[in-house]
Amino acid sequence: MALEKSLETGDGQEKVRKQTAVYVYEAPLRLWHWVTALSIVVLGVTGYFIGAPLPTMPGEAMDNYLMGYIRFAHFAAGYVLAIGFLGRVYWAFVGNHHARELFLVPVHRKAWWKELWHEVRWYLFLEKTPKKYIGHNPLGQLAMFCFFVVGAVFMSVTGFALYAEGLGRDSWADRLFGWVIPLFGQSQDVHTWHHLGMWYLVVFVMVHVYLAVREDIVSRQSLISTMVGGWRMFKDDRPD
């Protein structure tokens, strides 16, 4: 929510309104963000080569295990992403209220939709002045849920379903995700959707990085440094 709507009333509100720094993101959340970012990069690069392997390798096959290393890195990064996501869900329950913004999008609030439209206009350079937000702005919150949360769940489910094929029947992955391939129809369909999901996340990462840098420069609060140190730094003391 906007800054002035998330603080106390009276003299206390005026005092907080003029703060130029608020502690937002706790250490476990920041660590999860950067570990997840690294795992997505590894998954994207290795997944690309798994989908489009190198045409040939010189020498004897026994001396060239490059694709084996690529697959191992992909599987390891997949575990990191999935376990980290489960940890992130846990932290939504035990962390501060900003830790829950990723999962709880207040679509039932009219004010949220109004602020969402303001953010859309701001990103399209149709608004002169942006609003101030302690946590995610409405557009960022919606994008994180639709692209990251939905995307990460989809990629984890389809990825472990394909991983279960290698582990074999009655493996833990087959027991948990064996229903996925029959749902899609066949293994190749899951491969295709998993591959398309990679590009879905690639687009998200590109837009996310661009907007984070843009907002750090032209908005009224910090973004990148906030995810490093946890503090939201404001460039002015106006309330909204």
From Swiss-Prot:
State the annotated membrane topology for this chain. Answer: Multi-pass membrane protein
Its name, as the record gives it, is Probable Ni/Fe-hydrogenase B-type cytochrome subunit
Instruction: Enumerate the InterPro entries for this protein.
Output: Cyt_b561_bac/Ni-Hgenase (IPR011577), Di-haem_cyt_TM (IPR016174), Hydrogenase_cytochrome (IPR051542), Ni-dep_Hydgase_cyt-B (IPR000516)
Q: Where in the cell is it found?
A: Cell membrane
One Pfam family this sequence matches: Ni_hydr_CYTB
- Please name the GO terms of the biological process aspect recorded for this protein, alphabetically: respiratory electron transport chain
SUPFAM superfamilies per record = Transmembrane di-heme cytochromes (SSF81342)
Give the similarity note.
Answer: Belongs to the HupC/HyaC/HydC family.
Q: Does the keyword Electron transport belong to this entry?
A: yes
- Keywords, in A-Z order: Cell membrane, Electron transport, Heme, Iron, Membrane, Metal-binding, Transmembrane, Transmembrane helix, Transport
What PANTHER family does UniProt report for this protein, alphabetically? NI/FE-HYDROGENASE 1 B-TYPE CYTOCHROME SUBUNIT, NI_FE-HYDROGENASE 1 B-TYPE CYTOCHROME SUBUNIT-RELATED
Lineage from the top down? Bacteria, Pseudomonadati, Pseudomonadota, Gammaproteobacteria, Pseudomonadales
What role does it play?
A: Probable b-type cytochrome.
- What's one GO-annotated cellular component? plasma membrane
The answer, when asked if Cell division is one of the entry's keywords, is no
Bilayer-spanning residue ranges: 31-51, 75-95, 142-163, 196-213
Instruction: State the organism named in the record.
Output: Azotobacter vinelandii
GO MF terms, alphabetically ordered: electron transfer activity; heme binding; iron ion binding
